């Protein structure tokens, strides 16, 4: 199976984690698009979705799925999203689609986080994929200097403005051995909206697409 077929496979597998009558948290990205397409097939059995991005909201509405604002719900039974990297403990790098802040907001509402990804996203240590960081424009240079002190290079993602009107720095040259400590530190830097390490909101389950089928990892 190619990568697109693996994404379709895990997108469909994630339906098993959607309770009947529920509002489901929906992430952002190409793998999530496959989940949204699958979700459309059972839309009569759910109340709707809370979306983490404008793009996902548009796709959900195109499929006839009702979209609720995050502020309108107190909790969600499940949040389903992809990952750019996931480690053996369920910690992730996310934000390749520039929706990391809203993804964390929706993930925080959810009782469990189900990650859907192909097998290439499973790594021993986070950091090979460029780490996205959402930042205020006036703080870009300061934050770049902070990462330089860590031996990393932070580059502004050209032509990208987040749904929150901010910029994305992509950081290369990191090896994140303690994701929780790293997330906590970077989130305290003035001007950082959020860093794309998901350790406080790590996956409960990962549905990993492999040539042999879906492999379920529980954390």
UniProtKB/Swiss-Prot annotation:
Database matches in InterPro entries: NagB/RpiA_transferase-like, Ribose5P_isomerase_typA_subgr, Ribose5P_isomerase_type_A
One Pfam family hit: Rib_5-P_isom_A
GO cellular component terms, semicolon-separated: cytosol
Residues engaged in binding substrate: 28-31, 81-84, 94-97, 121
SUPFAM superfamilies in UniProt: D-ribose-5-phosphate isomerase (RpiA), lid domain, NagB/RpiA/CoA transferase-like
Any GO MF annotation of the entry: ribose-5-phosphate isomerase activity
Annotated NCBIfam families: PRK00702.1 (NF001924), rpiA (TIGR00021)
Record family assignment: Belongs to the ribose 5-phosphate isomerase family.
Protein name: Ribose-5-phosphate isomerase A
Organism: Methylibium petroleiphilum (strain ATCC BAA-1232 / LMG 22953 / PM1)
UniProt gene name: rpiA
């Amino acid at each position: 199976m190619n990568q697109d077929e693996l994404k379709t496979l895990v997108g469909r597998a994630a339906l098993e984690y959607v309770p009947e009558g529920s509002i489901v948290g929906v992430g952002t990205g190409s793998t999530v698009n496959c989940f949204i397409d699958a979700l459309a097939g059972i839309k009569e059995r759910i109340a709707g979705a809370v979306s983490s991005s404008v793009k996902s909201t548009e796709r959900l509405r195109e499929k006839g799925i009702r979209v609720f604002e995050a502020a309108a719900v107190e909790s969600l039974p499940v949040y389903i999203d992809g990952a750019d990297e996931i480690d053996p403990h369920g910690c992730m790098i996310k934000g390749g689609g520039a929706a990391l802040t809203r993804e964390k907001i929706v993930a925080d509402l959810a009782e469990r986080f189900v990650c859907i990804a192909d097998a290439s996203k499973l790594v021993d240590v986070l950091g090979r994929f460029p780490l996205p960081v959402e930042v205020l424009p006036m703080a870009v240079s300061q934050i770049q200097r902070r990462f330089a002190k860590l031996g990393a290079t932070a580059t502004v993602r050209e032509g990208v403005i987040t749904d929150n009107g901010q910029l994305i720095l992509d950081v290369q040259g990191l090896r994140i051995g303690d994701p929780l400590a790293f997330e906590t530190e970077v989130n305290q830097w003035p001007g950082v909206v959020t860093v794309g390490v998901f350790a406080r909101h790590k996956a409960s389950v990962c549905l990993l697409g492999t040539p042999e089928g879906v492999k379920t990892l529980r954390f």
